[in-house]
Amino acid sequence: MAKEEIRDAVYTRRYIYNFHYHLIWVTKYRNKTFVTEQLSNEMKSILQLVADDNDIVIKKMEVMPDHVHVLISFPPSKAPTSAIKALKGRSAFIFLRRHPEIRQSQYWGCHLWSPSYYMSTLGNMSNTSTIKNTTKLKNALTGAKGAYPSHD
């Protein structure tokens, strides 16, 4: 399959992938921590640093006073839980180390983030497109239509 046939796909030596996750997590006790633009931007830069270190691509990110939204993509060799652990764990460690006053006043237990999170996948093709592309691929591989029985 030619590269131009799969829009926004990532090509590596071993695989091609194109999937995205929408991830949301909240601060511990829903504390409103990122109340200034400076704190919000600092968390964005920390999350970008962590993502870069862990082969995670952040497509979109919003840091709200008490929660974070990210649209991420990462190789299929990485488990979604590993990506979440990296983003939440490392960002909390770096942020609280930089802000001991916030750690002492709001997060006495040393946890910036609530342990829970929401994650969903974002599809980039409809069922019709998937069926059409699968049929197209089958035809390309067999060299002619009708080489294998259809399961329609």
Predicted regions and their residues:
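Basic nucleic-acid-binding interfaces
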Residues: 1-152
